[in-house]
Structure formats: structure tokens, C-alpha cells
């Protein structure tokens, strides 16, 4: 499909396939993005988000702070995207505790997290 220059035909085939499976139903999700930290060990030239650990505007949300940011939106969303920098002190166990806490408090919310770079860092 990505190599087909006839995009209208590809879109028409996708619509036929979707209608065969789901009829005229359309599905949406409602999500929230929470940046748990801007502290990052990398210094990518294109990144304006990253801060070093000692920067005056560096922040790292602990799990309680993260949940407090999620709480006001929890009844309106079905997924949370958690993203941030490559924190020098956070281990996979930190993220396991964060994800477990989210699911314990908000079982209906799916967690979308960890980019490939974040996974490699851990």
C-alpha cells in the first residue's frame, strides 16, 4: 500500500475493508499526554524539551504527582500517553510501579508508554 501511487484507490479499498468488518461505525479514543520528566541524559540537537538534572526548570513527577495530574481527566479518557526524557536515575522498576499505579487507580485507562529510545535506555 505504501508504494502505490494511487492513493484514492488505496483509501477506497481501506473503506471497503472497514465497512465489511464494522459497517458504518466509527471509533474514537480520548487520551491525555503527561510528560513525567524533562530530565534527559541525551542532548539531541533538535530537542528543545530536554533539561539537565540541575537545570532550574527541570522537573520529574513522582508517582503521586503523576496520578494527581491524571485524576481530573480520568473519567473522560480511555488512554494516557506517558512520555519524557531519559531520566538518569529511573529504572524499569520505576516505570513498572508507575504503570501498576495507573492501572490500580484507573483500570479502564490504557497506558501508552516508552519509546524505543526509552526502552533502550532502560
Residue ranges and their predicted role:
Residues 15-16, 34, 100:
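Active-site phosphate/pyrophosphate- and oxyanion-stabilizing loops and adjacent acidic/basic residues
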Residues 35, 70-71:
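Short, flexible, glycine/charge-rich loop motifs used to bind or transfer phosphoryl groups or to couple energy/partner
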Residues 1-27:
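An N-cap/entry alpha-helix motif that binds or orients negatively charged groups
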Residues 14, 44, 82:
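Conserved, mostly hydrophobic/aromatic
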Residues 51-67, 73-94, 98-99, 103-122:
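Core AdoMet radical
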Residues 20-22, 26-65:
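Canonical Radical SAM [4Fe-4S] cluster-binding loop centered on the CxxxCxxC motif
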Residues 1-2, 30-35, 84-88, 117:
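Conserved short loop/turn motifs at secondary-structure junctions
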